[in-house]
Every structure is written in C-alpha cells, then in structure tokens.
C-alpha cells in the first residue's frame, strides 16, 4: 500500500515476534513511512534501479546455490510457477528480459533452469546461458501460463497441489507461503476452469 503498512500487517509482524525486516523494492514500491511503522526492529531495504537489479541483488543475498532459475521479469506467472522448483533445488530465481541482465558469474552454478517459453525468456538469453553452461540448461514451459505451471509440476512429481488463479498474481503469490516445507506443486488455473 502506498500509504504504508495496514494496521493488520503491523499487528501480525509483532505477533510473529519478528526482529529483522527486509523491505524488497525501492521507495516507489514500499514507502519510507513503513520503516517508521516498525520501531525497534532491524529494518533494511534491498532495491535496485529496476526489478531486474533488485532481483540480482536478491540472488546475491540468497548466497551459494548449485542451481539458478531464470524467468521473465515482465510477467508474474512464470516466476510463480518457478517457485516450487526453486524451493526444491534451494535456488534463487532471477528475473531477466535481456542479455545485459544476466549475471557475469554463471559458471558458479552447476545447472540453470529457464521457466517459460521463448516469448518469455528469449533464445538469445538461453544461448548465452548455454555458452557458459553447455548442456546443463533446462527449459520448462507450456503453451500458456497454466500449462507452464503444469509442466513444472510434471518435473517435480509432487502429490500435493495448490491451485491459484493464474490471471491475478495476488492469490498465487500469497499461496507461495504454503510451499514453506516444499513437496507441493503450485498450479495456476483459469478463472472458470481447471
């Protein structure tokens, strides 16, 4: 909310006993007033000039991983579909949309996963990743956002499914909290059908 945290959110943070808060995004995303709503807590902000730089900083913050997952930063659905895979692999998700957004240190990752079709993460990006990783690059995609999430689920082979509206990011983003222990698919569905 541009006006700051809602009262319920502040109350929940206190009830959870949180002592450290990380704000993700710049002042246009999360206003400075949020910090004043959280007195006595360690609050820090991770942000960049755009969503891609913020994503890159979060990947760095994530720490070491043997894997990395790439998704299109212009569309939320593929990033949401990638979340159960990233959880299983204990890997960060990096938002990309052009070659200049790729990390320079691709070689540190054992393998890379691209979630989404060639219209989401282009062949130029895939080829650049392959030039470093060789055959350790895997693309998972479907004809649309719902089938992409289904293809990720096919790879994971989990028995438990979380269904969320694939047309609106809010429900699916909230559902990511249910992935805390892994072992669940996040399936995006159309509003009027499964």
For the regions a protein language model found, what residue spans apply to each?
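Extracellular glycan-binding segments that recognize GlcNAc-based cell-wall polysaccharides
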Residues: 1-194
């Amino acid at each position: 909310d541009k006006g700051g945290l809602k009262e319920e959110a502040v109350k929940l943070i206190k009830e959870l006993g949180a002592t450290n808060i990380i704000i993700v995004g710049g002042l246009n995303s999360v206003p400075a007033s949020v910090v004043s709503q959280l007195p006595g807590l360690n609050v820090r902000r991770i942000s960049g000039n755009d969503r891609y730089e913020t994503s890159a900083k979060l990947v760095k913050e994530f720490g070491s991983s043997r894997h990395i997952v790439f998704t299109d930063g212009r569309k939320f659905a593929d990033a949401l579909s990638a979340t159960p895979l990233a959880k299983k692999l204990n890997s960060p998700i990096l938002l990309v949309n052009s070659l200049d957004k790729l990390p320079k240190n691709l070689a540190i990752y054992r393998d890379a996963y691209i979630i989404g079709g060639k219209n989401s993460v282009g062949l130029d990006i895939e080829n650049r990743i392959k030039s470093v990783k060789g055959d350790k690059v895997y693309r998972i995609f479907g004809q649309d956002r719902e089938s992409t999430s289904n293809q990720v689920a096919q790879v994971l082979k989990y028995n438990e499914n979380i269904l969320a509206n694939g047309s609106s990011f809010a429900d699916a983003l909230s559902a990511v909290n249910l992935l805390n222990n892994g072992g669940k698919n996040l399936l995006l569905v159309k509003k009027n059908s499964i």
